[in-house]
């Protein structure tokens, strides 16, 4: 449940809310999980490190919370299930999963091992398995569509399905969230498309 000051200042779903408006403990836990995904493979890719550093700045964490996030990269013991259960009680669940998938995709490849790792997190966050699959297909499709002048109908279908899910689950996108990590231009297009999608459905 959101703190009173957060609940009263919520903007429309079609806008991009600032993550820094949320309690710092939520933001710390959020980025600790992102860091865990970044090091879920044997080697931390430079693009993953760059993305994590950028997000740490955008999340405006207190100094000790920043240290806690970067400590995860050094394989400091992390009670991940406990953190996931805490975050499962917030409204950040689906936004977090999008960012976790974005981090996993930061090196340009989403490996089966990473998908398995993400699925385990999704279970503790109490994300429906069908919803998880829709988001995975969305991440794949956005990456592929960004490389085409005329995206295939299947990719368009997967993007539309994800938008419908996000609307149904009241997902709020943040400016830092990358809907397409491989292309800043297409990422912006998707965010604009999302806002039009929300506006169109709100007017029905």
Task: Label the model's feature ranges.
Residues 2-38, 43-204:
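Small-residue-enriched hydrophobic alpha-helices in membranes
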């Amino acid at each position: 449940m959101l703190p009173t000051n957060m609940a009263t200042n919520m903007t429309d779903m079609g806008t991009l809310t600032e993550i820094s408006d949320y309690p710092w403990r939520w933001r710390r836990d959020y980025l600790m999980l992102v860091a865990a995904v970044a090091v879920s493979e044997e080697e931390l890719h430079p693009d993953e490190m760059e993305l994590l550093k950028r997000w740490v700045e955008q999340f405006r964490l207190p100094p000790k919370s920043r240290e806690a996030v970067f400590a995860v990269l050094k394989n400091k013991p992390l009670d991940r299930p406990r953190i996931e259960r805490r975050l499962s009680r917030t409204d950040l669940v689906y936004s977090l999963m999008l960012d976790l998938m974005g981090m996993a995709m930061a090196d340009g490849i989403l490996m089966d091992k990473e998908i398995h790792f993400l699925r385990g997190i999704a279970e503790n966050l109490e994300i429906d398995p069908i919803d998880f699959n829709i988001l995975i297909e969305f991440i794949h499709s956005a990456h592929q569509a960004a490389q085409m002048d005329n995206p295939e109908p299947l990719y368009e279908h997967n993007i539309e399905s994800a938008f419908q899910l996000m609307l149904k689950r009241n997902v709020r996108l943040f400016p830092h969230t990358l809907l397409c990590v491989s292309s800043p231009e297409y990422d912006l297009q998707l965010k604009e498309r999302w806002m039009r999608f929300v506006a169109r459905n709100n007017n029905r």
